[in-house]
Amino acid sequence: MKLSFKFKPSISKKQLEIVEELSYHTTKLYNIINYDLRENGVKTYYDIEKEYKSNWHCDFLHSHTRQQMFKVLEQNWKSYFASVKDFGINPTKYKAKPRPPKFKNTDKNKNEIIFTNLAIRYDNGLLKLSLSKAIKSLFNVESLNFEVSKKLQSIIDWNSLQQARFNYDKVQKCWYLIVIYKKEELENNKTNVGSIDLGLDNIATLTFKDVLNQ
């Protein structure tokens, strides 16, 4: 199964500049394509990729980051059309008729930056996120690196990461990092039975049928 973990990384001035630069280009590109879809009709991910992969903003985005943004935008439009269809059947579920996906804002509504597992490396306590050649040259770095504390290392398996997402908190005005990772799903012991008794003196009492195996 896949799980997610959200935390606020310790970001240096240079790292923040890189994140903001990536956010600027993915936000601008999102808006350009979204405007096109609003004016000229919806397109598939493959059509978007074919038409916009040569846009100059893409030079500053790793190919996997760019492609994930395209897929998110495509999904946003699919969700919109599904909502419009459902609105026609169940209008009372909605306060108003669904509207097309909104535009992003480089200051207040920054677009999410997504790195897939192909753009993520973890090496001896260091999380490395792949960057485009243009960003590497602009900031004189090989990758966007973050030290993972011992505490965080103990919480999840960093070698099983599937995605890393930078998400901007509009209220706190800071960046959070969301990592999505794989974890083996344990089989439930279907032969055992447990019950919870909410009490007055004790918060709760847990009772198991097969106590010796707990």
Regions found by a protein language model. Name each.
Residues 1-214:
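Nucleic-acid substrate recognition interfaces
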